[in-house]
């Protein structure tokens, strides 16, 4: 399909695969369509209760390959990669923000957002402890101050793995 942008392909793939994966007990976390090392690559990130293993990735790959081939959404030759979202899992849906409440997150807005906390200047990035999703906004504690970032202003949000905290818990 000539002329279709990277975002459009990812959106089309998402709409094709999401219902199938949900039926099979998986959550479609993210779809990326990008040119890597000179080759087109479709990355499909999945999750499920209890986590994702290599067998899950193989099973999902076998499930989605024929769907993508029949739908013929992607014209150029490409590599398909299926994996877990990793330690820095992206957060997109309102339920993601509630599910990971208590975790450290980084949130990036499309542009500067004013009024996220009383007296706070407009900003584009926040890193803090996720409190959840309320009334159309993501709530997070940044250095003891509660910020509310409107969901429709968020370009990207993801978990931040706390290496030091994890090491302290193991001692």
UniProtKB/Swiss-Prot annotation:
GO biological process annotation, one example: ribosomal small subunit assembly
Keyword tags: Cytoplasm, Ribosome biogenesis
Keyword set includes Lipid metabolism: no
Transmembrane segments: none
Localization (cell): Cytoplasm
GO cellular component terms attached to this protein's record: cytosol
Matches recorded under Pfam families: DUF150_C (PF17384), RimP_N (PF02576)
CDD domains referenced in this protein's UniProt entry, alphabetically: YlxS_C
Cysteine disulfide links: none
Family: Belongs to the RimP family.
Protein task: Required for maturation of 30S ribosomal subunits.
PANTHER family on file: RIBOSOME MATURATION FACTOR RIMP (PTHR33867:SF1)
Name this polypeptide is given: Ribosome maturation factor RimP
Organism per entry: Anaeromyxobacter sp. (strain K)
């Amino acid at each position: 399909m000539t002329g279709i942008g990277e975002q459009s392909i990812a959106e089309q793939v998402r709409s094709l695969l999401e219902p199938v994966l949900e039926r099979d007990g998986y959550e479609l976390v993210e779809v990326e369509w990008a040119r890597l090392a000179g080759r087109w690559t479709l990355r499909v990130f999945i999750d499920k209760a209890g986590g994702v293993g290599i067998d899950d990735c193989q099973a999902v790959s076998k499930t989605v390959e024929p769907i993508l081939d029949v739908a013929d959404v992607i014209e150029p030759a490409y590599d398909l990669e299926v994996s877990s979202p990793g330690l820095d899992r992206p957060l997109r849906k309102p339920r993601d923000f509630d599910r990971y409440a208590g975790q450290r997150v980084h949130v990036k807005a499309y542009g500067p957002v004013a009024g996220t906390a009383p007296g706070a200047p407009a900003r584009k990035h926040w890193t803090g402890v996720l409190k959840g999703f309320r009334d159309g906004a993501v709530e997070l504690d940044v250095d003891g101050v509660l910020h509310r970032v409107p969901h429709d202003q968020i370009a990207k949000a993801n978990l931040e793995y706390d290496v030091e905290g994890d090491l302290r818990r193991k001692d």
